[in-house]
């Protein structure tokens, strides 16, 4: 896909002024953009009033889309440092214009951001990037790029719990207290499915269509937006039939928009929220572009303001982490499945996958409102449709419990999903362990879920292959990191540990010499009023295993991890299991440092479960019983034969290398260690409600 066709050529300023002096040139410029001549004169008049920015070097960086066909060179988002005020943003923009004019270049400020993030959108020559990066307050600059719509009645039955399944879809809550913002094409608001439920705002920021010099009217191309509005809240085919919606037009008739247009749309939502605070807000982003630091940052700001953002994973049959806003950690990212709960295939492409996907939802042959007429319906497919389902489910959950935080909502979506129903063989082999096997579903009840201890598994990005490379996994701000583990496909790793970073604990994993890289795996939980700490025991004396326990009164063990400096711990037979009667203890190899995660919270109780098997098995699992939640997952022994340990739902999985490549003997054993916790106070509260 090419760049937007309206991009202008850039002329040196003296030549441009000569052209403006001539009658023909003046008329042409006036037709093209009437305010350019006034801008040139204004810049010349204030040129002497603005001093040059100091050029003592800069820490500002430049970013652009990795997908070359999606780039829009000539338009740039200049992001300023977080504490920059609006007046400083405006002065920085004027300074850029004045200094560019001194060098013979014309620039145009298209938008000044404030309220969501500080910065401005500028149209200028790429020759000015070095100058712009040295301006005061600049944090980074990102070249604009394109984003695209992600669309190419079984679906309502699929997301409904069995106890509610009947001849009609009748969810326990319609989402009437929630407002959903849709950033898409426009919407045919008089369609009988959504009439009276959707307000079409006056917001519009779309690029010209490829091969044209004009915008078609929104009413001529509102199929995608109309369909998604119907999926979210349609009278007959909608998920949250009581939710109200507002639409912002950020995609043109070809389903194409820009990162900058999406940013301005998100800023519009934030300003609306500040001017007229309402109840819970859900923002549906059924679009995808290349990875964008600035778009992810804007999503983060809006999420931290209390807005729930749901986005399409993308339809490129690729790692969702390569796309935005799908890669933003604060966004709920949704992949697409079909009626058989299998990943959606769209020609040679299909749903995206990987660690940045939170869950999947129905996204193939979804019946919804059509813009062809006010009573027409049409079938569409894609991760846009899947995201619309989750936006509807989120609206119903928030309507039932308006005080839910983003972290609480995400944990509930994961907890109540259908598990282990997707055929993982569809995904690339290296993505199978990273991709969640979850299909969205409504909870059996939208009330009473608060008594459960919710946890999820968060994978880091893959580290580099160098010996000292590390990977870091982080929990959301409202979550507690209760345990840390690591995984390497080659088995060449040096373990993991928890450390404080920016006032929060993070999980750091270490690659080993000759390794191909490592993943850090965090177990992130909702644990109100928790007080957690990490206790470490250094490598033990020869002939002894290393042990560490929770020594603070009232603290219980929630996770164990180990880290070693040697390249190969060798074998350890049999695995060192903890002595009976000492549950609050982590044990490990004598040459490793052992770390115990210890937490105190009202009514928190935990227990350890172990399951060991002899070689040659390459995987061992152990699960927590119903009513208990997996908080920790680790392996014994922690040797280089073990690929790593990770949690899937409530099960601890430990994998080892192929026996034929390790030289292991049948005398050696492999054990999975699960730590299972629950809150007695929450359980008692639930029993009282019943």
UniProtKB/Swiss-Prot annotation:
A GO term, aspect molecular function: serine-type endopeptidase activity
Gene: PCSK9
Active site: 184 (charge relay system), 224 (charge relay system), 384 (charge relay system)
Statement: the UniProt record of this protein carries the keyword Cell division: no
Disulfide bonds, paired cysteine numbers: 221-253, 321-356, 455-525, 475-524, 484-507, 532-599, 550-598, 560-586, 606-677, 624-676, 633-652
Propeptide feature: residues: 29-150
Extent of the signal sequence: 1-28
Pfam families associated with the record: Inhibitor_I9, PCSK9_C1, PCSK9_C2, PCSK9_C3, Peptidase_S8
Subunit and interaction comment: Monomer. Can self-associate to form dimers and higher multimers which may have increased LDLR degrading activity. The precursor protein but not the mature protein may form multimers. Interacts with APOB, VLDLR, LRP8/APOER2 and BACE1. The full-length immature form (pro-PCSK9) interacts with SCNN1A, SCNN1B and SCNN1G. The pro-PCSK9 form (via C-terminal domain) interacts with LDLR. Interacts (via the C-terminal domain) with ANXA2 (via repeat Annexin 1); the interaction inhibits the degradation of LDLR.
The protein's required cofactors: Ca(2+)
Organism: Gorilla gorilla gorilla (Western lowland gorilla)
Annotated function: Crucial player in the regulation of plasma cholesterol homeostasis. Binds to low-density lipid receptor family members: low density lipoprotein receptor (LDLR), very low density lipoprotein receptor (VLDLR), apolipoprotein E receptor (LRP1/APOER) and apolipoprotein receptor 2 (LRP8/APOER2), and promotes their degradation in intracellular acidic compartments. Acts via a non-proteolytic mechanism to enhance the degradation of the hepatic LDLR through a clathrin LDLRAP1/ARH-mediated pathway.
Stretch list, region C-terminal domain: 448-690
Record protein name field: Proprotein convertase subtilisin/kexin type 9
Keyword Ribonucleoprotein: no
EC number(s) per entry: 3.4.21.-
One annotated GO biological process: regulation of neuron apoptotic process
Family (UniProt): Belongs to the peptidase S8 family.
Sulfotyrosine found at: 36
Activity regulation: Its proteolytic activity is autoinhibited by the non-covalent binding of the propeptide to the catalytic domain. Inhibited by EGTA.
InterPro entries linked: PCSK9_C1 (IPR041254), PCSK9_C2 (IPR041052), PCSK9_C3 (IPR041051), PCSK9_ProteinaseK-like (IPR034193), Peptidase_S8/S53_dom (IPR000209), Peptidase_S8/S53_dom_sf (IPR036852), Peptidase_S8_subtilisin-like (IPR050131), Peptidase_S8_subtilisin-rel (IPR015500)
Domain of life per record: Eukaryota
PROSITE patterns according to UniProt: SUBTILASE
Record key words, sorted: Apoptosis, Autocatalytic cleavage, Calcium, Cholesterol metabolism, Cytoplasm, Disulfide bond, Endoplasmic reticulum, Endosome, Glycoprotein, Golgi apparatus, Hydrolase, Lipid metabolism, Lysosome, Phosphoprotein, Protease, Secreted, Serine protease, Signal, Steroid metabolism, Sterol metabolism, Sulfation, Zymogen
Phosphoserine: residues carrying this PTM: 45, 686
UniProt site (Cleavage): 150-151, 216-217
Upper taxonomic lineage: Eukaryota, Metazoa, Chordata, Craniata, Vertebrata
